[in-house]
Each structure stands twice: as C-alpha cells, then as structure tokens.
Amino acid sequence: PNAWDIGVCNNLLNMLAREKGVEYDAEGSIAKSGKIIDDLLDKMLSISYHKLPPPKSIGVEWIHKELYPLLDKVADHPIEDRMRTAVEYIAISIVNDSPKTGKILVTGGGAFNHFLIQRLNELADEVEFYLPESDVINGKEAFAFAFLGLLRWLGKPNVLKSTTGASK
C-alpha cells in the first residue's frame, strides 16, 4: 500500500480546543502545557484499528465512536491534559505506522502544530519529518484532486486498489 489513514489529527485536536473556547490549538501551546493521562493514552493506543494492516481508512464517525467515549470518561481532567494526551496518541500512532528511516513529508493542518512536530521528531530516531512551504501544506488536497482529475481526463486510472483497499 502507498497510502492509508494512520489515525486522526485535527478533528480530534480541534474538538478538544473548542472546549477551551478556541477553534484550534495554535502551534500546540495548549497541549504542550498539559500532562499525559497514562490510562487514557494506553486505551487510545490499544484501539483495534491500529492493529489492522493497511490500507485502512478512518472517518469522522470513527472518531465519534472510538475516541470520544474514552475522552468523555476523563472529562474531569483539565483540557490541557486531555489535549497533551491526544497529541502523544497522534504522534505515537504516526511513528508506529511509518517507515523507520528516511524523510516523511508532513502536510495538512497538523503540520502547523509545532508541538506535534516536535513530538514526532523526538519519538522517531531515524526519521526526519519534513515540513514543506505553507502553500504546499494548505494546498495538498487541491493539488491531489487536480492530479486525479488530470489522470481521469487522460483516461488513466486515478484510483488504485493498493492505496484505497478497494477490491477492483
């Protein structure tokens, strides 16, 4: 497989940030100020999705079903601690499901979370998490869909079962 959903990032972090009264955790500063809730982290990491072989895919409904109930059980903990635990969960999930050496291009809104990127680099000894220019980060999905459209226009396959897990 060439691509799959490792886990969640901004959907989870933004949901928690809204509890703090902000739309997102700018640069990861709220999460950085918290402490890890070990029991919560263990439960998040033991979710069966992480044991599935790629390709695999996650949607928002998965977050509601699998993660929100775990977070609800620790609602009495400060939001900073829940966010810190979420960042650690995301970073560990990414590192566990990524190549162990080389460079990995980081795109999407999570690339602007400096604390998440810091944790990725601290957890992965032989991997460099590379951040492209902000235009590339912001435009990733538009670029991808434009490329898929071009392939379709040229009459070439634009969906590969090795990437999506489709049967044909």
List each model region and its residues.
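Short hydrophobic/aromatic-enriched beta-strand-loop microsegments
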Residues: 2-6, 126-132
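Conserved ATP-utilizing enzyme core subdomain
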Residues: 2-87, 91, 154, 158, ...
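Catalytic-loop motifs flanking and including active-site residues across diverse enzymes
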Residues: 8-13, 86, 116, 138-141, ...
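A structural micro-motif
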Residues: 22, 102, 125-128
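Acidic-glycine-rich active-site phosphate/pyrophosphate-binding loop
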Residues: 62-70, 115-126
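Glycine-rich phosphate-binding/hydrolytic loop that grips phosphoryl groups
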Residues: 88, 132-168
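Phosphate/pyrophosphate-binding loops at sites that engage ATP/ADP/AMP, CoA/4′-phosphopantetheine
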Residues: 94-102
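Glycine-rich phosphate-binding loops at beta-strand->alpha-helix junctions
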Residues: 102-120
